């Protein structure tokens, strides 16, 4: 709009910084790929000061603090933090206000294996290092915000912790700031061969931290508390709530931590309830989805089974959804669902009814989901197996998972060189130094193997995550190799198709594509009549 353009023009004039270059795409890149938000801003609680990442000719070594005065333009203060880190190229992955004049900033080097936590003074621009983590491979959970005590003397964050031969798992660390020296001491509050997913709240009155974890199962999420003093006693607050149908939860606490909202997401029909923190057994059901539950009970839906496969010294989960009339005497096509990025998880206890459910019930297709090496929430050892060999080891696992099935189709999203650079470099390294790694992960070398296959490519023209050049390069090689393909374009849609009409069209396209090719290639064999005894 003209008004927004007017505001932007004023902002540009008031931020007087000779030589500073602003790039819209880089702003998105930092915001969504690193901070996991769409706008790279961090607001103080009273909404009067904003910390904002900027790009300079010397890489992202400047932070802009914008003071809002209720007018159309924003006078700004520029804080240069050179000298804080030992490397020239780094990312800011997290900014959190500690007080009106101090911010906590996490810096990540370009290879993403060195993370430095600093406290920066907004009035002087000076930053002091408080905590550093180094790794031989990339570091995950770098956009997570620490949870602070009210006086700022201690804060809690999720860090990788070694757990014997099983490797590292994410756990909660309490960092205490020494009053006189401002040095930080660290105490680990949790440990074990399971993952802390998210820190939800800190109650100073009871001195307890509340968090979600995979302690019971990597496929589930349970709400736990742990004491920050004494023997660090741990308690599960959700384990006894509707345990027959609820093992996967999310939760949110009230401002004073007296109550919490518990969202059961599966495996049964989702349920939302409010609980008293001091007595979780005292609760009120807000939504039980009774109509949905009754509808499902009336229908004969598909059966789901989870198998553990032993591959390369790992026990990896394979989830199979069978048609309602499945029998061992028939032959079925298998659709393997592949997620888009390392650290993702497909085999969970979440309630799931999606487009692929239609294929299972209507087209008698077995749908498989598999979490192989490179998947998340099973420890860092499994996750980091794809380091410098993405597109190789996880593909071997996927082939092993379906090798007993005669007919297989795949549905995946996106894997690298034309991908967002921070994402690609995290797993494959810097292109100029790791050209062989990028080449090894490319599908273009095996393009002739697709000659006899059916291929559907879907891309939104406004996709800023995987640029359209990615698909264009693939199509160019498909044409050269004489491979037939179908291309579906969605104008003005991003990486995730957003509008309802576009989503309906996308699902119809995918269902039609798989239904046609799977029926053609893997017809169900007629059942043989059983002999009377």
Q: At which residue positions do the language-model features occur?
A:
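Active-site-proximal cap/loop segments of hydrolase catalytic domains
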Residues: 369-533
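Conserved beta-strand positions that form and line the central face of beta-propeller blades
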Residues: 48, 61, 129-130, 185-189, ...
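Beta-propeller folds
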Residues: 1-253, 258-259, 265-270, 347-348, ...
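Cap/lid segment of the alpha/beta-hydrolase catalytic domain
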Residues: 135-136, 289-408
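Conserved hydrophobic/aromatic "anchor" residues
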Residues: 97, 148, 365, 490, ...
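Active/binding-pocket-proximal capping segment
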Residues: 110-111, 120-127, 132-136, 168-196, ...
């Amino acid at each position: 709009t003209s008004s927004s353009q007017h505001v932007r023009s004023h902002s540009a004039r008031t931020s007087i910084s000779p030589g500073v270059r602003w790039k819209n795409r880089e702003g998105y890149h930092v915001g969504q790929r690193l901070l996991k938000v769409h706008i790279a801003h961090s607001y103080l609680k009273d909404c009067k000061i904003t910390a904002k990442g900027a790009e300079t000719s010397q890489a992202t070594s400047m932070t802009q603090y914008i003071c809002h005065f209720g007018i159309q333009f924003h006078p700004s203060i520029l804080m240069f933090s050179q000298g804080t880190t030992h490397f020239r190229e780094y990312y800011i992955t997290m900014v959190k206000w500690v007080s009106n004049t101090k911010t906590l900033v996490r810096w990540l080097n370009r290879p993403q294996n060195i993370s430095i936590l600093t406290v920066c003074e907004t009035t002087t621009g000076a930053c002091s290092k408080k905590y550093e983590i180094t790794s031989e491979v990339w570091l995950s959970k770098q956009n997570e915000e620490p949870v602070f005590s009210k006086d700022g003397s201690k804060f809690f964050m999720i860090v990788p912790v070694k757990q014997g031969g099983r490797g590292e798992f994410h756990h909660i660390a309490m960092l205490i700031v020494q009053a006189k020296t401002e040095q930080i001491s660290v105490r680990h509050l949790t440990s074990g061969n399971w993952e802390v997913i998210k820190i939800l709240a800190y109650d100073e009155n009871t001195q307890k931290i509340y968090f979600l974890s995979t302690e019971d199962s990597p496929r589930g999420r349970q709400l736990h508390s742990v004491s920050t003093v004494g023997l660090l006693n741990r308690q599960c607050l959700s384990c006894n709530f509707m345990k027959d149908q609820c093992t996967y939860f999310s939760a949110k606490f009230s401002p004073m931590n007296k109550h919490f909202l518990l969202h059961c997401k599966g495996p049964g029909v989702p349920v939302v309830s409010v609980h008293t923190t001091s007595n979780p057994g005292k609760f009120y059901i807000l939504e039980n989805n009774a109509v949905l539950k009754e509808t499902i009970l009336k229908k004969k839906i598909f059966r789901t089974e989870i198998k553990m496969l032993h591959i390369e010294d790992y026990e990896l989960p394979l989830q199979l959804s069978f048609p309602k009339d499945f029998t061992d005497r028939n032959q079925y096509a298998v659709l393997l669902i592949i997620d888009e990025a390392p650290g993702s998880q497909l085999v969970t206890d979440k309630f799931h009814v999606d487009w692929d459910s239609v294929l299972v019930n209507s087209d008698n297709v077995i749908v498989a989901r598999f979490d192989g090496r490179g998947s998340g929430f099973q420890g860092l050892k499994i996750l980091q197996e794809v380091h410098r060999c993405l597109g190789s080891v996880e593909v071997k696992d996927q082939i092993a998972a379906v090798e007993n099935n005669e007919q297989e189709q795949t549905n995946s999203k996106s894997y690298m060189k034309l991908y967002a650079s921070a994402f690609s470099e995290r797993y494959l390294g810097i292109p100029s130094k790791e050209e062989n790694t990028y080449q090894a992960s490319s599908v273009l070398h095996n393009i002739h193997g697709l000659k006899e296959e059916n291929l559907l490519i879907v891309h939104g023209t406004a996709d800023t995550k995987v640029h359209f050049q990615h698909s264009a390069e693939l199509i160019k090689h498909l044409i050269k190799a004489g491979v037939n393909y179908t291309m579906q374009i969605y104008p003005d849609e991003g990486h995730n198709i957003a509008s309802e009409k576009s989503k309906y069209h996308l699902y119809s396209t995918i269902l039609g594509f798989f239904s046609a090719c799977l029926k053609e290639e893997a017809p169900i064999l007629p059942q043989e009549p059983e002999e009377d005894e």
